[in-house]
Amino acid sequence: DNRDGAIREDDGTLYVAAEGHEVAYKIENLCDRRYGVGADGLMLLDSAPDGFDFKMTYFNSDGSGGMMCGNGGRCIVAFAADQGINHFDFIAADGFHTAEIVSQEGRTKIVRLRMKDVSGMDRYDALTGVSCASEGCFMDTGTRHYVRFVDDLDQYDIVSEGREIRYDATE
């Protein structure tokens, strides 16, 4: 039974999902990789304003507020279903989202999530002051992403290149 809280993994990213704000102050300890569950973040399933089924509140593993995350959004929908919620129009930090569970086998659910439309691609990130290399850009899907264009994806070392981009302060 997942009614008291859940640890959800989606695409290699680990999240803790829980109801209400009673656990918010413990986020950093819960997510700690050595002494906690080692999660990438914590999401709270909260009551929402009229017109929505629930509110997703996302926190980064250090306890700071986070933005919408697609993997996390699918996980919170699966958790909401475990709580008896069967309609998935929800609000998150970036606005409205809708989802559906397209299949389920045992406790495994396949969730289709509608993300916000990307409004544009920028070569400069005003929030961080970072300029992109000519082969990439920033876009916002609820959370800022860096996208790099490549000619032959099969020959591209995604893991190494992704690690380099993520931890390079100039990109």
Describe each region flagged by the PLM:
Residues 1-108, 147-171:
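A glycine-rich beta-to-alpha transition motif near the start of alpha/beta enzyme domains, typified by
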Residues 57, 113, 137:
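Beta-strand scaffold of nucleotide-dependent catalytic cores
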Residues 61, 118, 143-144:
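Short glycine-rich anion-binding loops that position phosphate/pyrophosphate groups of nucleotides
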Residues 102, 114-118:
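Solvent-exposed residues in well-ordered beta-strands and their adjoining turns
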Residues 107-115:
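Short, solvent-exposed secondary-structure boundary/capping segments
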Residues 119-123:
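Short, charged/polar, Gly/Pro-enriched secondary-structure boundary elements
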Residues 128-130, 134-155:
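Internal active-site segments that recognize and position negatively charged phosphoryl groups
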